[in-house]
């Protein structure tokens, strides 16, 4: 299908350019000429462009490197969607600042130390039968040997676990085909205990290994007590992949430094880079994780280190669960083919890719045909007899990802700055493309799963150099999108990454992920359960227990309740905040001056903040997320008084009050305004009821939100009436103003519901009508004309029925408004609105499309 579309795009462009050479230069050509763009550039732009409201085909999750976060963007547009706070505090989301997210971050403390940064490398998606299912994402922290769990229901980090025996883990996260375990492999060997041993004890005491973190899918949590590790020799283990299909149950981990070199550049010895590369080969670790999972159940097969179960090398070897195969020196990536038979190893210092054959490996193991053992007693298989074959690719082969076609694979060449497409079954190179510059990881869509999709490939490059506007010596990273849908790879787009060095990407079809757009009211987003501090409207309160103060607060457009909080200096304050909105994307933020506090509350979410009121004074708090026209008024005061002080209060002058007559006029004015607003609201509710809004869940949620807001008006009306009956007109006006606030919130949700309902039930727009709507909006027409209402200009419903030869008349009027000003009808319109339509310099094509848009409006006139 994509090849067909590719061909059609070329044909369309060819026809376009052929036609236009005989005509005046089109705006399309003018733009290309002005910007120096080729037809190939224009085609690339078409392939990645998403009009407003159109979503991408794929999500891509990228390890954020030094940022300690995970970046999410869409493909093919490459538009960034979110930075997920993982190992590093992230203030916009309140991650690491409110109590609930801080608990997650503090799970990552190591030996009593707060660790507030991470080096995120390899995100991995949860799998079902080797296929991505879109439920969870896992990512490792190389610097501090940690794994995080991200719940894709909310796109938030829900757990961090610290490796109990390793100090650095690069080979994570890697997932078994049904997400039974998350594998995390040691990088730099150390003693597995936390004790000191000199470097001279390297061979005897230092060890590597792999940790199997047991994952409970129902709980969405790693179960530390059910997890275990396998001890490896102190070779420096690198990346891992899990078997699938015929190789299900097995895992494969690369390593370097089979020389067991320990450095010493400061003593005049060769550096690590030289000492670790002397030998011609290193070792691929091959181990049966299903057998290991059975072995660990018997405590005789384990030793306990730092409270964690570890299977020693000798136990794994004795039970036929661990083997080594030589591989070309200093390998990096290891990747199992979608069917599980082929294992592709990347050699950084070798121009060849090595393809191992799982069937051959199994036969050698079954026949116990080994060429020897290493220093630690692990059987070694013959490299040549294990190989399916080798292919010469180029310099600096680092990583691989699989394409949709049988046998297709794409590899990154760091030194050559290239992506190479080749066939691992036929052992031949198919295509190469240059990138910019020095590619590291590589990700074709779902290219590491059992069901690769092809379509696009992302090159995660290490250098950007001259690709973007200069921003000083520290450059952004460059992720490049490549079209792999045809026989030849095509570079489409460069994307600057401004925060951290991205490592591995994990991609998945957007149709597989279904995030929530709101929480069940009172949810703790980090646990997915109802928060102990859940507070509904009307339940707001302040409770004191000794020097502990508990505040139960709500946030809704456009106020925080309570708005005045008075505590004593030295009080321990706990504040529970609930966003009681239901409308999608109505997020509220919360901060208090001087307290180093910030939290983000999505609709329905409850969170907790704790602080000690240890300084006297008055501290404003407010909503940090712009949420309504009266956002700035969404604030309050924390007042901290010293209980040991005697304050002398100065009576402030009262503001000059309005006269009784002026108050009465003001009261009647706002009553009239509220009655008019209420008529609009009732018309909206009537429209929604008549059009059976309940059939559309998103519309229904908006209407529920609108009715919730409207239901609060009755109480305010009672307060207003009571105040008025007591001749307290000032308070009556205040309560009527509160009624207006609730009406505005009601109308906001109801109008959004109406617009969404119209888009759901209206007749589909033609392509011309869609373009006409864009031209109408971008040409400034919507500044004066509101469809279905008289605004600064007339309502345009039925505009094509107001004149003879209406389409021609409207076209002429848009083209040259002044030419119609003399007509009697237009003279009256100009006099009524006191405006003349300016010439918007619309093209003939835009005018034609706008008329098609007007036709669509008339077809659906009863909806406006």
Language-model region placement:
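The canonical Cys-X-X-Cys-His
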Residues: 70, 620-626, 772, 778-788, ...
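Electrostatic cytochrome c docking/interface patches
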Residues: 645-649, 653-665, 755-777, 864
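N-terminal edge beta-strand
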Residues: 542-572
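Extracellular/periplasmic metallocenter environments
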Residues: 539, 601-662, 861
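Predominantly soluble domains enriched in secretory-pathway, periplasmic, or organellar proteins
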Residues: 24-543, 547, 585, 610, ...
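C-terminal capping alpha-helices of c-type cytochrome domains
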Residues: 137, 737-759, 808, 835-864
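Detector for the c-type heme attachment site
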Residues: 75, 358, 626-628, 777, ...
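Gly/Gly-Pro-rich "capping" loops immediately C-terminal to redox-active cysteine motifs
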Residues: 635-641, 773, 783-816, 821, ...
